[in-house]
Amino acid sequence: MNKLNPLKFGIIGCSRIAKKSVIPAILKSEFAELEMIGSRTNDKAKEFSNEFNCKKNGTYDDVISDDSINVIYISTPIGTHEELAIKAACAGKHVYCEKSSTDSFTSAKKMVECSKNNNVRIMEGFMFRFHPQHQKVKELINNKKIGNIDSFNG
């Protein structure tokens, strides 16, 4: 059996979700490697790199232009997502963008068209549907263990 080459991730944005969820998941996966961390400030990029034993760090553009990276995880403020996702796609990188990926249909359309034109994938980071805590809540609801549901916002 052939072993798949791991996806080499570049992180753009040193957010809490990157720190607590995404980077630990990358480090645990046999199918992914943490290649580089980028931030607006060198100090923050170095801090995250040291914490996660990542050898490379730099700016957002450094991450996008690094030839060893094939997937970019974007975890920055929503107003930066379109520009960063398009730059990454134009550089031939797949994009995993934290939710919400954009605040407009026009912006989303540009991001998707760019990824199609560059033969890369783009995905929004909405992954809670099958999270164990949500599955447990679903089980409790289905087994009528928590009473009647009058409304739900999720």
Kindly give the residue locations of the regions a language model identified:
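Conserved SAM-binding strand-loop segment of SAM-dependent methyltransferases
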Residues: 53-60
